[in-house]
Every structure is written in structure tokens, then in C-alpha cells.
């Protein structure tokens, strides 16, 4: 669970759920790229007033759960994350640049939403953490028939 950030003139708890797709939705975020992105985000935390509460990767997009301060605009948070991660991924994994012929790692678009402190923060954190994993659906009734059982 996130903590309140105490600054000289305010106390806050602002959390954003950010989703950034790769350029052309290319499937390039494999194990090594996933680890590279997470390591880069640790460096971003050290240099900027933003804290990554959770990072979840799928093959063609990344979910970030980020806590920041009111002085940082949401678009600047996204811009910082996307620019630094792209530059460092290309530097540490030059073969990725060949797969993305336009020279950009991320698309220009993104999704961003605020996350409430109470119940939704844990729900979104769980969702972000489980990115890229197979969905586990619970079957309610073992004898339950489906629409196409007879076919």
C-alpha cells in the first residue's frame, strides 16, 4: 500500500495508473526487456519525485502504478517515463531498435487514470502485477453446460 508523501508545504497521496503500448504494438517486451524496464524505473525513482508502486509488462505494453507529487503534471510524468525508458532500452538492447523501424520504442499515445487510495489501489495493483500472465477463471459449477456443448 502506498504511503503519504510529506513535502515542506503539503502531504499527498496521488497515484496514477499509466499504460504505454510499444510502437506498432510490436511484441518485443520479453523477459530481458521486462527486467531492463524495471531497472530503469528504479533509476527514475532515484532521480525524480515519482515512485513506482507496481510495474506489469505484457508482450506489447507496460502498466505502471506511479505515485507522484502535485507539482508534477501527469503528462510530464508520462513523458519522463517514456523518454528515459526508451533511450535506455535502446542503449542496453540495440537489437530492439531493428525491430522498431521508426526509431521510437513507445507509441505517442498512452492511457492514464488516477487511482483511489482505499479499495481501488489494491485492485489496480493486483491487475498491474498480473499483466502478461494467463487468466485464471474459476468455474462455478462443474456440471454447468455451455451454449455449444452439443456441437
Task: Label the model's feature ranges.
Residues 1-151:
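Basic nucleic-acid-binding interfaces
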